Curated annotation (Swiss-Prot):
GO terms for molecular function: rRNA binding. It comes from Methanococcus maripaludis (strain DSM 14266 / JCM 13030 / NBRC 101832 / S2 / LL). The keyword Mitochondrion does not apply. PROSITE patterns: BRIX (PS50833). GO terms for biological process: rRNA processing. The keyword Kinase does not apply. Keywords: Ribosome biogenesis. Probably involved in the biogenesis of the ribosome. HAMAP family: BriX. InterPro entries: Brix, Brix_dom_Rbsml_bgen_prot. This is Probable Brix domain-containing ribosomal biogenesis protein. Residues 1-164 form the Brix domain. Disulfide bonds: none annotated.
Length: 164
């Protein structure tokens, strides 16, 4: 899976892309002047980190099998802000949803987890946790054992969009 940014990303957006690439073992595409239409034509599964007011503000996960996009508005803390270090996941990755985020499990499996070669339903070393803040907000965090490794994403809205 490829991860990239909107054009002319800020340093904070590039840092988030690097953090996510290290955790999920994504390939980073330095977008440069590549138009979005060209990225979509390739039909490679991808994630685009978009900016709002100069900061990473939206994550779009493209699913070309269903011709849909999982779009999430977010705020975040980078790995260096959460754990003080850059964490590279070289092991198996799993997920854990609390009772209030359980309904999101199928979306994240369909759009993200089933496309990862290192994702396992059990016997994993690193866990992506989904936990509720309130009825409209939840966190996605990366844990190894009991330690939060970062990044920590606070998701405010989740929408399913059509790829046009």
């Amino acid at each position: 899976m490829i991860i990239t940014t909107s054009r002319k990303p800020s340093q904070r957006t590039r840092s988030l892309v690097n953090d996510l690439a290290r955790v999920f073992n994504f390939k980073i595409l330095n977008r440069g002047k590549i138009p979005l239409s060209e990225l979509i034509e390739n039909k490679d599964d991808m994630i685009i980190v978009e900016e709002l007011k100069g900061n990473p503000g939206r994550l779009k996960i493209f699913n070309f099998e269903n011709n849909k996009i999982l779009s999430m508005n977010l705020s975040l803390k980078l790995q260096r802000e959460v754990s003080g270090k850059a964490f590279k996941n070289s092991g198996k990755l799993g997920s854990k949803f609390d009772k209030n985020t359980e309904h999101l499990k199928e979306f994240f499996f369909e759009y993200l987890f089933k496309k990862l070669s290192n994702y396992k339903e059990e016997n994993f070393e690193v866990v992506i946790t989904f936990k509720t803040v309130d009825e409209s907000t939840f966190y996605i965090e990366v844990h190894k054992g009991s330690e939060n490794m970062g990044p920590s994403l606070k998701i405010k809205t989740v929408k399913i969009l059509d790829i046009e």
